[in-house]
């Protein structure tokens, strides 16, 4: 018989750097999960993606065991990394803060494909381009 899921927790954590401190501790503690076990497993699985923020969805079961699914890094994080920026524009419609090329856009779209609701790489590229536009980053040919 399948285990009964009693909670779903969504977090965005730095790769390889999950600690029992907030936000991880309180989120998992209220479901009675072994926090150190999660931190060790998460850090082991994300060690090769250092410097990225990795979203994770944790399923907590009735017997207080857990499983988790790693997602691809948020589009905004990948775009900022490609453009070499720390943050997007405060006024994206007025102030442009950076540029990315079509090739970089395609690379980001291919990275995000598993998590995007897109049928083709072209439609994924237009989604990522929209995110870039809303951050004040222009896409060049």
Swiss-Prot record:
The answer to whether UniProt assigns keyword Cytoplasm to this entry is no
Q: Which UniProt keywords apply?
A: Methylation, Ribonucleoprotein, Ribosomal protein, RNA-binding, rRNA-binding
Against SUPFAM superfamilies, the record matches this protein to: Ribosomal L11/L12e N-terminal domain (SSF54747), Ribosomal protein L11, C-terminal domain (SSF46906)
Give the HAMAP family listed for this entry.
Answer: Ribosomal_uL11
Q: Which CDD domains match?
A: Ribosomal_L11 (cd00349)
Source domain of life: Bacteria
Q: What Gene Ontology cellular-component terms does the record carry?
A: cytosolic large ribosomal subunit
The job of this chain, per UniProt, is described as: Forms part of the ribosomal stalk which helps the ribosome interact with GTP-bound translation factors.
Return any one Pfam family short name. Ribosomal_L11_N
Classification from the root reads: Bacteria, Bacillati, Bacillota, Clostridia, Eubacteriales
Any GO BP: translation
Q: Name one GO molecular function term.
A: large ribosomal subunit rRNA binding
Note the Gene3D superfamilies from the entry: Ribosomal protein L11, C-terminal domain (1.10.10.250), Ribosomal protein L11/L12, N-terminal domain (3.30.1550.10)
Subunit structure and binding partners = Part of the ribosomal stalk of the 50S ribosomal subunit. Interacts with L10 and the large rRNA to form the base of the stalk. L10 forms an elongated spine to which L12 dimers bind in a sequential fashion forming a multimeric L10(L12)X complex.
Q: Name the protein family.
A: Belongs to the universal ribosomal protein uL11 family.
Post-translational modifications: One or more lysine residues are methylated.
Annotated protein name in UniProt: Large ribosomal subunit protein uL11
- What InterPro entries does this protein map onto? Ribosomal_uL11, Ribosomal_uL11_bac-typ, Ribosomal_uL11_C, Ribosomal_uL11_C_sf, Ribosomal_uL11_N, Ribosomal_uL11_N_sf
Keyword Magnesium assigned to the entry: answer is no
